[in-house]
Amino acid sequence: MEIPVEFLLEKTIIVTAVFTISLVIAMYSTYAERKVSALLQDRIGPNRAGPFGLLQPLADGVKFFMKEEIIPSSANKALFILGPSIAMMTACLTGAVIPWGSYLEIGGDQIALQVTDINIGVLYIFAVVSIGVYGVMIGGWASNNKFSLMGAIRASSQMISYEIAMGLSIIALVMTTGTLSIGEIVQQQTTDWWNIVYQPLGFFIFMVCSFAECNRTPFDLPECEAELIGGYHTEYSSMKLGLYLFAEYINMFISSAVMSAFYFGGYDIPYIETLGLDQNTVTILGTLFFFTKIVLFIFLFMWVRWTLPRFRYDQLMNLGWKIMIPMAIINIIITGACILLF
């Protein structure tokens, strides 16, 4: 079956746009991280590279490219290179099923601002995120360094533990919406209340698990400098280290987008239809509103990092297995009871 050229061109443009936006936001998240930490610590932050330090991410990128590529002599070279590649690849793939806006009307055609709206989009995100564990584990093991291996083991156990609670929290959301399509979940919220109204406990569980999945403070045990030097990427340098750091910030961006889409209406602006605007204007405003929500969640990630202390490892595991998972199961029971009664 021949694929229309227009379809290929449309999807190529959307894929390129999503990939580029993800990289740019990841770059400037590093700048925002420093500015937020400076704000909370009564400092100025980066202000040398360009006006207000806005060129600092570009300076960091040049620095990573110029650093020497070092592969330890005792490392498994193939897997050492493969680890950060897997981490970066899985971070970028998750954006394919997120609806970044409604649709644009161009030349009589409706162009959806989504790479693909598969009917199992929720499962796709969990499948891709699960593969990301291999990038961390392979990188830590291939380094042939005890600190790297310990960090990789910590990361794997942490991510697997919190994926269970995250999955259970999404089961309650799927019970409420009746679909696994992310596009349909967002579309339902444009004609009804946002899902945060129906699933406040589910959102809280999902948000906490997102912090753990992204290895962000207070869940940054896999790379805590005080115990493990740098964790699973201790032996990495140059762009291979840059790929791991980029993947972390892209994961933070995608997690913020998923939380916004699942629980806060995605691109939906309440009552915008009463303004009588044309479809393209509504879509553009909705996309800008969606990214505003994402930026607020990214700020929350950074705010928590610079205000809360790190958990001990036993506290981390106890929180995941003894508190978050039972809470998620209780949330499913409550959701089922509400569906039956109301």
Swiss-Prot record:
Q: Indicate the secretion signal residues.
A: none
Q: What class of enzyme is it?
A: translocase
For this protein, the parts annotated as crossing the membrane are: 7-27, 78-98, 120-140, 166-186, 193-213, 245-265, 284-304, 322-342
* Membrane topology value: Multi-pass membrane protein
State the reactions this protein catalyses. Answer: a quinone + NADH + 5 H(+)(in) = a quinol + NAD(+) + 4 H(+)(out)
The protein's superkingdom reads: Bacteria
> Which cellular components does GO assign to this protein?
plasma membrane
Q: What is its main location?
A: membrane
Biological processes, Gene Ontology terms: aerobic respiration
Q: Where in the cell is it found?
A: Cell inner membrane
**Pfam families for this protein:** NADHdh
InterPro entries per UniProt: NADH_UbQ_OxRdtase_su1/FPO, NADH_UbQ_OxRdtase_su1_CS
Keyword list (alphabetical) reads: Cell inner membrane, Cell membrane, Membrane, NAD, Quinone, Translocase, Transmembrane, Transmembrane helix, Ubiquinone
MF terms in GO: NADH dehydrogenase activity; oxidoreductase activity, acting on NAD(P)H, quinone or similar compound as acceptor; quinone binding
Q: What is its EC number?
A: 7.1.1.-
Keyword check for Aminoacyl-tRNA synthetase, yes or no. no
Its subunit composition reads: NDH-1 is composed of 14 different subunits. Subunits NuoA, H, J, K, L, M, N constitute the membrane sector of the complex.
Q: Which family does it belong to?
A: Belongs to the complex I subunit 1 family.
The record's listing under PANTHER family reads: NADH DEHYDROGENASE SUBUNIT 1, NADH-UBIQUINONE OXIDOREDUCTASE CHAIN 1
Function per UniProt: NDH-1 shuttles electrons from NADH, via FMN and iron-sulfur (Fe-S) centers, to quinones in the respiratory chain. The immediate electron acceptor for the enzyme in this species is believed to be ubiquinone. Couples the redox reaction to proton translocation (for every two electrons transferred, four hydrogen ions are translocated across the cytoplasmic membrane), and thus conserves the redox energy in a proton gradient. This subunit may bind ubiquinone.
Q: What is this protein called?
A: NADH-quinone oxidoreductase subunit H 1
Q: Which organism is it from?
A: Cytophaga hutchinsonii (strain ATCC 33406 / DSM 1761 / CIP 103989 / NBRC 15051 / NCIMB 9469 / D465)
